[in-house]
Design a protein with these regions (language model features):
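P-loop NTP-binding core
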Residues: 1-252
């Protein structure tokens, strides 16, 4: 049975897509069966895995048009993908009147739970209905975040939302962990924020940190995860190390 992970942070530009793509690819390279479900209308995680944003059927078709999840899966050499496109932006509005609207994604994906070791759902940078659907479907939430001042405020809001979802909609929902991204060890603020997070959240913060990396930024333009595009750069090595730590935590 798959472990279901929502990758969420309501703040944009924190490395959510990069982390989703590279962690999925790293786990796949390690022999795990992984599915990435792109729930972000921007579709950047899809293209980062080499899947065109025009690919149909996709997440929108699965949620709104009744397409079977298995029909939406695209196979790649570094993990499976259910892609997203800009049409997904309308899904939150179209789901408003749906029966049990917060559970549509979970019901759609249930047929795939036994096919994978891990299923990652990439959430949009907001706490709207698509994100709520992912939180309801998930076992745990993985939170990528930058070490900057405003991130501390944002993480408090997100943890409150997760707690509320856990109380009302998904009692098993927990925090998988927090991944520090775009990490600059030379900056005093980075160290201060990291220390504050670890003081507040303890071992929920991963030991592995993800440094800034030009090669990771270049990889999506080639339709490849960074860990495939350039395996020896420090960003890729960090994501491979994160995958090892993720597996160790998951399989305790």
């Amino acid at each position: 049975m798959a472990k279901i992970i929502a990758v969420a942070n309501q703040k944009g530009g924190v490395g959510k897509t990069t982390t989703s793509v590279n962690l999925c690819a790293a786990l796949s390279l390690m022999g795990k069966n992984v599915l990435l479900v792109d729930c972000d209308p921007q579709g950047n995680a899809s293209s980062g895995m080499g899947v065109a944003k025009t690919q149909r059927p996709n997440t929108y078709d699965m949620l709104i048009n009744g397409a079977a999840a298995a029909e939406c899966v695209v196979h790649t050499d570094y993990g499976d993908v259910i892609p997203a496109s800009k049409e997904l932006a309308a899904a939150s509005v179209e789901l408003i009147n749906a029966v049990e609207r917060e559970f549509v994604l979970k019901k759609a994906l249930m047929s795939l739970f036994s096919d994978y070791d891990y299923i990652f759902m990439v959430c949009p940078p907001s706490l709207e209905l698509l994100t709520v659907n992912a939180l309801v479907a998930a076992d745990n939430v993985l939170i990528p975040m930058q070490c900057e001042y405003y991130a501390l405020e944002g993480i408090t809001d997100l943890l409150t939302s997760i707690k509320m979802c856990s109380k009302r909609l998904n009692r098993r929902l927990g925090i998988e962990g927090i991944v520090l991204t775009m990490y600059d060890s030379r900056a005093n603020l980075t160290t201060q924020v990291a220390n504050e997070l670890r003081r507040y959240l303890g071992d929920k913060v991963y030991e592995t940190v993800i440094p800034r990396s030009v090669r990771l930024s270049e990889a999506p333009s080639h339709g490849l995860p960074g860990v495939v595009y350039d395996r020896i750069n420090r960003g890729s090595k960090a994501y491979m190390a994160l995958a090892v730590e993720f597996i160790a935590r998951s399989e305790k």
